[in-house]
A protein has these predicted regions:
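A translation/RNA-centric and nucleic-acid-associated enzymatic feature enriched
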Residues: 86-184
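Long, well-ordered alpha-helical scaffolding segments within enzyme catalytic domains
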Residues: 46-63
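Short, small-residue-biased leader/transition segments that mark boundaries at the very start
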Residues: 2-7, 185-188
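A generic structural motif
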Residues: 33-44
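Short acidic/polar capping segments at secondary-structure boundaries
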Residues: 16, 39-41, 118-120
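Alpha-helical scaffold segments that mediate packing/assembly in large oligomeric complexes
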Residues: 60-96
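Conserved alpha/beta core surface patches that mediate binding of polyanionic ligands
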Residues: 4-31, 139
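Active-site scaffold segments
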Residues: 31-35, 181-184
Length: 188
Protein backbone atom coordinates (compact mmCIF):
# COMPACT_ATOMS: atom_id res chain seq x y z
CA UNK A 1 0.00 0.00 0.00
CA UNK A 2 1.15 3.52 -0.74
CA UNK A 3 1.76 6.24 1.78
CA UNK A 4 -1.56 7.74 2.83
CA UNK A 5 -3.30 4.37 2.61
CA UNK A 6 -1.84 3.00 5.84
CA UNK A 7 -4.30 2.92 8.72
CA UNK A 8 -3.85 1.92 12.31
CA UNK A 9 -6.84 1.15 14.52
CA UNK A 10 -6.84 1.34 18.28
CA UNK A 11 -9.78 0.05 20.30
CA UNK A 12 -9.85 1.45 23.80
CA UNK A 13 -12.13 0.31 26.59
CA UNK A 14 -11.90 2.41 29.72
CA UNK A 15 -13.66 3.32 32.92
CA UNK A 16 -13.92 7.04 33.55
CA UNK A 17 -14.72 6.97 37.24
CA UNK A 18 -14.96 10.77 37.55
CA UNK A 19 -17.22 11.24 34.51
CA UNK A 20 -20.44 13.15 35.08
CA UNK A 21 -22.99 10.82 33.50
CA UNK A 22 -25.98 11.93 31.43
CA UNK A 23 -27.83 10.92 28.24
CA UNK A 24 -24.62 10.90 26.18
CA UNK A 25 -21.83 10.31 28.74
CA UNK A 26 -21.24 7.08 30.62
CA UNK A 27 -18.62 5.77 32.97
CA UNK A 28 -17.69 3.03 30.47
CA UNK A 29 -16.01 4.15 27.25
CA UNK A 30 -15.61 2.06 24.10
CA UNK A 31 -13.56 4.31 21.86
CA UNK A 32 -12.16 3.49 18.43
CA UNK A 33 -9.27 5.59 17.19
CA UNK A 34 -8.00 5.48 13.62
CA UNK A 35 -4.67 6.83 12.44
CA UNK A 36 -3.83 7.51 8.81
CA UNK A 37 -0.25 7.94 7.65
CA UNK A 38 -0.02 11.08 5.51
CA UNK A 39 2.65 12.93 3.57
CA UNK A 40 4.13 16.15 4.91
CA UNK A 41 2.52 18.09 2.04
CA UNK A 42 -0.91 16.83 3.21
CA UNK A 43 -0.58 18.78 6.47
CA UNK A 44 -3.12 21.43 5.39
CA UNK A 45 -6.74 22.47 5.83
CA UNK A 46 -7.82 21.17 2.42
CA UNK A 47 -6.66 17.66 3.32
CA UNK A 48 -8.37 17.89 6.71
CA UNK A 49 -11.63 19.06 5.08
CA UNK A 50 -11.57 16.20 2.55
CA UNK A 51 -11.09 13.75 5.41
CA UNK A 52 -14.01 15.32 7.28
CA UNK A 53 -16.20 15.05 4.17
CA UNK A 54 -15.31 11.35 3.85
CA UNK A 55 -16.17 10.65 7.49
CA UNK A 56 -19.40 12.66 7.22
CA UNK A 57 -20.42 10.78 4.07
CA UNK A 58 -20.04 7.52 6.03
CA UNK A 59 -22.19 8.92 8.85
CA UNK A 60 -24.92 9.86 6.36
CA UNK A 61 -24.81 6.43 4.69
CA UNK A 62 -25.10 4.79 8.10
CA UNK A 63 -28.07 7.00 8.96
CA UNK A 64 -29.75 6.11 5.63
CA UNK A 65 -29.13 2.39 6.16
CA UNK A 66 -30.61 2.54 9.66
CA UNK A 67 -33.65 4.45 8.39
CA UNK A 68 -34.29 1.68 5.84
CA UNK A 69 -33.94 -1.01 8.50
CA UNK A 70 -36.11 0.77 11.08
CA UNK A 71 -39.03 2.78 9.77
CA UNK A 72 -39.26 4.90 12.92
CA UNK A 73 -35.83 6.48 12.32
CA UNK A 74 -36.02 9.85 10.59
CA UNK A 75 -33.23 11.24 8.44
CA UNK A 76 -31.92 14.36 10.16
CA UNK A 77 -28.44 14.89 8.73
CA UNK A 78 -28.18 17.47 5.94
CA UNK A 79 -26.50 16.54 2.66
CA UNK A 80 -23.45 18.69 3.34
CA UNK A 81 -21.47 19.59 6.43
CA UNK A 82 -20.70 23.27 7.09
CA UNK A 83 -17.13 24.23 7.98
CA UNK A 84 -16.38 26.98 10.50
CA UNK A 85 -13.39 27.96 12.62
CA UNK A 86 -13.52 28.64 16.33
CA UNK A 87 -12.59 32.28 15.60
CA UNK A 88 -15.51 32.64 13.19
CA UNK A 89 -17.86 31.17 15.80
CA UNK A 90 -16.56 33.64 18.37
CA UNK A 91 -17.15 36.53 15.93
CA UNK A 92 -20.72 35.33 15.27
CA UNK A 93 -21.59 34.71 18.93
CA UNK A 94 -19.23 36.89 21.03
CA UNK A 95 -21.46 36.89 24.12
CA UNK A 96 -21.92 33.11 24.25
CA UNK A 97 -19.84 30.27 25.65
CA UNK A 98 -18.07 27.97 23.19
CA UNK A 99 -20.65 25.20 23.79
CA UNK A 100 -23.51 27.67 23.20
CA UNK A 101 -21.84 28.80 19.97
CA UNK A 102 -21.64 25.20 18.78
CA UNK A 103 -25.29 24.63 19.73
CA UNK A 104 -26.65 27.71 17.90
CA UNK A 105 -24.62 27.09 14.75
CA UNK A 106 -25.33 23.34 14.70
CA UNK A 107 -29.05 23.99 15.17
CA UNK A 108 -29.00 26.43 12.24
CA UNK A 109 -26.95 24.21 9.90
CA UNK A 110 -27.68 20.64 11.01
CA UNK A 111 -24.09 19.40 10.75
CA UNK A 112 -20.96 21.43 11.35
CA UNK A 113 -17.22 20.95 11.42
CA UNK A 114 -15.60 23.20 14.01
CA UNK A 115 -11.93 23.68 13.14
CA UNK A 116 -8.85 25.10 14.85
CA UNK A 117 -9.53 24.09 18.44
CA UNK A 118 -7.01 24.65 21.22
CA UNK A 119 -5.35 28.01 20.63
CA UNK A 120 -6.49 31.19 22.37
CA UNK A 121 -9.24 33.19 20.65
CA UNK A 122 -9.63 37.00 20.53
CA UNK A 123 -11.16 36.91 24.02
CA UNK A 124 -7.97 35.32 25.38
CA UNK A 125 -9.54 31.93 26.05
CA UNK A 126 -9.36 28.73 23.97
CA UNK A 127 -12.59 27.40 22.47
CA UNK A 128 -11.89 24.06 24.17
CA UNK A 129 -8.89 22.35 25.69
CA UNK A 130 -6.55 20.32 23.52
CA UNK A 131 -3.22 18.76 24.46
CA UNK A 132 -0.30 20.74 23.01
CA UNK A 133 1.64 17.61 22.02
CA UNK A 134 -1.04 15.77 20.04
CA UNK A 135 -3.00 17.48 17.25
CA UNK A 136 -1.91 20.67 15.50
CA UNK A 137 -4.34 23.29 16.81
CA UNK A 138 -4.52 24.84 13.33
CA UNK A 139 -5.34 21.46 11.74
CA UNK A 140 -7.95 19.80 13.94
CA UNK A 141 -11.72 19.56 13.93
CA UNK A 142 -14.85 18.26 15.63
CA UNK A 143 -17.84 16.95 13.67
CA UNK A 144 -20.94 18.14 15.49
CA UNK A 145 -24.58 17.57 14.56
CA UNK A 146 -27.78 19.03 15.89
CA UNK A 147 -29.73 16.26 17.60
CA UNK A 148 -33.38 17.39 17.84
CA UNK A 149 -34.50 14.56 20.15
CA UNK A 150 -32.42 16.03 22.99
CA UNK A 151 -32.14 19.55 21.50
CA UNK A 152 -28.33 19.45 21.73
CA UNK A 153 -25.20 19.89 19.66
CA UNK A 154 -23.77 16.36 19.63
CA UNK A 155 -20.08 15.76 18.91
CA UNK A 156 -19.73 12.61 16.79
CA UNK A 157 -16.05 12.75 15.93
CA UNK A 158 -12.93 14.60 16.94
CA UNK A 159 -9.94 14.49 14.63
CA UNK A 160 -6.77 16.25 13.73
CA UNK A 161 -3.47 16.18 11.95
CA UNK A 162 -0.66 15.46 14.39
CA UNK A 163 1.83 18.15 15.36
CA UNK A 164 5.07 18.45 13.47
CA UNK A 165 8.25 19.77 15.11
CA UNK A 166 7.34 23.43 14.49
CA UNK A 167 3.75 23.14 15.76
CA UNK A 168 4.89 21.12 18.77
CA UNK A 169 7.36 23.82 19.82
CA UNK A 170 4.82 26.62 19.33
CA UNK A 171 2.02 24.82 21.17
CA UNK A 172 4.17 23.71 24.10
CA UNK A 173 5.34 27.31 24.48
CA UNK A 174 1.76 28.66 24.33
CA UNK A 175 0.64 26.05 26.86
CA UNK A 176 3.42 27.08 29.23
CA UNK A 177 5.29 23.80 28.86
CA UNK A 178 8.58 24.84 27.19
CA UNK A 179 10.44 22.55 29.59
CA UNK A 180 9.08 19.62 27.59
CA UNK A 181 10.94 20.76 24.50
CA UNK A 182 14.04 18.85 23.60
CA UNK A 183 16.15 18.17 20.56
CA UNK A 184 18.15 15.18 19.47
CA UNK A 185 21.28 17.27 20.21
CA UNK A 186 20.27 17.55 23.87
CA UNK A 187 19.97 13.78 24.15
CA UNK A 188 23.63 13.26 23.11
Amino acid sequence: RGLGDVYKRQDMNAIRRDEETDNIHSIFVDQWDWEKVIRKEDRNLDFLKETVKTVYKCLRKTEQYMAIQYDYIDLILPKDITFITTSELEEMFPDNTPKEREYYFAKAKGAICVMQIGDKLANGEPHDGRAPDYDDWALNADIIVYYPVLDIALELSSMGIRVDEKALKEQLDKAGCPCLLYTSDAAD
